[in-house]
Amino acid sequence: MDEHESLERILDGRTWDDFCDSLKDARTALFRESSPANAFDRAEGYRHLSRLLRVALERFVEHADPEHPRFYQMARADAKLGADNPDCCYRNCALDGRREYRIRGQRGTSTYLGIGTYYGH
């Protein structure tokens, strides 16, 4: 899909329709045979999906500009991602491998500060 078609899809609403259809498809995980079928667990499943949606919007919409990166907290108590450590404070930001960045700040009382880079999505 070229840029012109992408813009047309935004203008005529197809992009939004596709987004909403993908949200409908996301619920299929809650209805697998192996998934609990009681009201409490089903509601928790919807809650978890809505939190994952919020995390995705924060990452890919609100904080996706590598020309103006800013740290934000993706994994947190109200948005668990599965393998986060409760003793750690995770921060993320979008970067471009073709650019150079400088991080400034104070480490404070932290005994360890680790920085990792990852390629792709």
Summary of predicted features, one role per range:
Residues M1-H121:
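A compositional/structural signature for long, glycine/proline-rich flexible linkers
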